[in-house]
Structure formats: structure tokens, C-alpha cells
């Protein structure tokens, strides 16, 4: 087969697919252009999840006719003149790829007008080709309307998600800009319904609008400077850690994914974090553009620092200093005793699980509880072996088995007074799209920005409903990757861990005997997360070690 040179139009569409991967990336690129244009009001409109139409309107400086007629062409930009400029700019877009890429794979209409012009101008570009240009009477600023995304790349359009999923990802991108630019009036509508209308305000007020479940009095402002670096943002106090992850990192106003920054944040809270607990942190790191490489990823969401160690120490120490974190090692688990007691009393579940050793199936009465050591381990003696049982892991697996076997039985508890939970638009859309909570035993309805919970599973205490729902959202986001069944198991595993007896909880010998009997009867060897439940020592091995045989 002979090697051929690809047609220019094919090359353009392939390249565009690297920059634009879905509705969310169009929204991201167009909002960035609006911010670069100095806009203090940006309106985003989505129709059918953005697959039919995406509209971004701003009141920025606008473009003259000559600029408008070249803005959709390859590598056209007003921000750099030489290659070295890409390492010294603070603007978001700069490579001249975004608008060009969008126009290559859609039907795009652009309106723009500067303050000094009497008239604005309108152009339409279809698959990268200019269809028309004409003068129009409009206000200062730019409006970009993107229709039929990937209409000319059917293979890529086929892989767009459902309307709900595409919209949810776009809303998440929009929310990041709301956090990084609270001084801008940002408005979002979906199918002509207003989702957000956020006036220019402070970061704390933005957080309040986007995260109604976070206690405002737990947020501490962060403002720190060292050498040529600055850190601004908010972080939650160590007493208000939660199971749902909410960490947003920005560099020079740009949302980024960077393991170094994540590690620095978690390091600041290291003395307080228990398993599956996270801080709420929104930080914006400012440093000279020459010390950052944003060209690691086509969408510029990954960055590299030339001063890794300095950045890590600065971010970590700034958070610790501003929060005035004391050196203590205790934080409330918030696990209701009522839930723990109820879970101890249930009968043996039907579900069976394999184990690493078939010999663990021991007659229920053929063991003896020697005692409980370090408020953590049950010591069990049988005729041939000594077992050390982690009672938290064992109890966790028993709860998991029961909950798994009760799925789809619709035996929940109706609430006399429904629980109202305020959630973000993207979170409500996620819950509405998926059926996980209803399969677990919930019944609810969505009214405006609230989830109204009317029925809960029998194993959940009403005081824990809000916490459970919020904790489950991050797992539900993974359905498209892992599938409904796996995500349901993950949620149930997390509930089991939370509800199970913990180290240092009081456990009498009768409860210990019950747990051990259930472990042997159900051939349990690991907790739902894969940790071992018990460790065994053969008496012959002990005798050999002590040279008694």
C-alpha cells in the first residue's frame, strides 16, 4: 500500500478533534476567549446538551471586521508574535487553534463589534469555509453560536455522550470559571431554562452559590505571598472535612490538573485526614508565566512547574499558616451509634462470597473467643489454629453482604417529613439521569435546585441522609466508565465502611462471637475494599517456631 499525503481538510478535522473533544471543550475555549477580551459579563446557552447549539455571548472589546474575517483561520491570534511568547503570556488562548478547530467541525456564526465602530459584523463559517459576511447592528462584544458539533465528522459525533451527560460536563466547566473569576457576571441556560445567574461578587459568595452544603463559617480565606508567587482562595477548617472531594486548583486563573498541587493540599491537612476524607479547597496560584508550561496537553488543563519544590512548600505552608492548624490528631467520625447498633443485630445474609481457603468453613461451635486486644482484634482459638480477626473489616463485609442482597426489594422507610438537599445543577442532572439511588432504596423528586428525599433504605438513619447523598455523587459520576453495577457496589462498600464498628468501639464477647460465627458461616476472607478480615497461625507452625517438635 502506497503512502499518501492526506487532504488538507482531513488534516484539519483530525487536528480539530485533538482540541475539541465535546461540548464542554467548546464552552471552555469560548469562555476563555471572552475573558481574554476583557468581558465582565458572559452568557452561555446550551440547546439539547449543546449538541444542537452552543452560544457564548460577552461584552468584551470585540473585533474589527478585518480581524473577524481571519479569526477562524488556522493559527491566527492577537497574543503572540514569536515562539518564546507562549512562555510569557498570562492570557488563556494564545495558539490560534481553538476557534479555528471549532469552525472546522461545526456550523459557526460569529457576531462582533468594538466600542469605536458604528456597526458590528456577522460571519458564518461551515466546516472551515466562509459562507457570508455582513454588517449588523449589535452591542459591543462578541457572540459565537456553534451548531451541529461534529456534523462533518460522524465517527466523532457518534461518540458524543447523551444530552444530559454533555450538558453536565459543560456545567462543570462553567462552574470552574465561576470559581476562578468571581468578579465576572456569569449566566448559564439549558434549553432556555436559567441554571445559574451569578452576579459579580466575592469568592466566598460564589462558593456559597455553587456549594450550598458547605458551612460558610467553616471557610477560611487564603492570601499569601512569597518571592514572586501569590496564593489566593478559600479552604475549609480541619473540623469540617468531608467524604466528598471538592478541590479546585487554578494557576494564573486557569483550571489545572496537577498532582503536585493536590499533594501539597493534602499534605497541609495530613494530621487530620482519615480514610476517604477530603478537604474543601479552592486555590488560585499566581506566578510568572515563564515558570509554567501549559503546553503539556492540547486543552491546557495540565501544567508543569520549573520550580516544583518551591511551589509545593509555598502552597502547603500557606494553607497551614492561614488556617492556623493546631497539632492534634482527632476528628469526629459523625457515625451515629443508632446505625452501628442496628447493623450488629441483623440476621445472616443470603449472599455468599468465596475465600482464599475452603478450610475456613468451621462448624459454628468449634471455636473459642480468647479475647479482644487493642480494641481492634478478636483472638479466636480452634482445634488446629489461632485466628486474629479485624472486627471492623469483618463487620463491614457482613453489612455489605446484607445490603447487596436487599437491592431492588423496595423495602425502604417512608419519611413523614421529606429531607431537602440543595445541590448544584450538575449534581442534580447526574442523579436524575442515573437510577442508582432508587435501586438502593431511595425515592425522591427534584424541584428547582433541591433533591426532595421521600423514602430511604431501611439500613440508613434519617440523620445521615444528606451526608450519604453528597458522599455518593462522586461515585455516580463514574458510571459511564465502570458501569451501573460496579458503581452501586462501590457506594454500598463505602456505606458499609462508615456504618461498621470502628477501632476502639466497645465490643463485648457475645458480639465478638456473633461476628466470628458469621464470618465462618459465610466463608468471608476480605472486606469489600479487598483488605483481609483475618490472619491465621497454625499451632504446628508455632510449635516448630518454638522448637517444641
From Swiss-Prot:
PROSITE patterns: DNA_MISMATCH_REPAIR_1 (PS00058). It comes from the Bacteria. HAMAP family: DNA_mis_repair. One of its GO terms (biological process) is mismatch repair. It comes from Pseudothermotoga lettingae (strain ATCC BAA-301 / DSM 14385 / NBRC 107922 / TMO) (Thermotoga lettingae). GO terms for molecular function: ATP binding; ATP hydrolysis activity; ATP-dependent DNA damage sensor activity; mismatched DNA binding. This protein is involved in the repair of mismatches in DNA. It is required for dam-dependent methyl-directed DNA mismatch repair. May act as a 'molecular matchmaker', a protein that promotes the formation of a stable complex between two or more DNA-binding proteins in an ATP-dependent manner without itself being part of a final effector complex. This is DNA mismatch repair protein MutL. CDD domains: HATPase_MutL-MLH-PMS-like, MutL_Trans. NCBIfam families: mutl (TIGR00585). Belongs to the DNA mismatch repair MutL/HexB family. GO terms for cellular component: mismatch repair complex. Keywords: DNA damage, DNA repair.
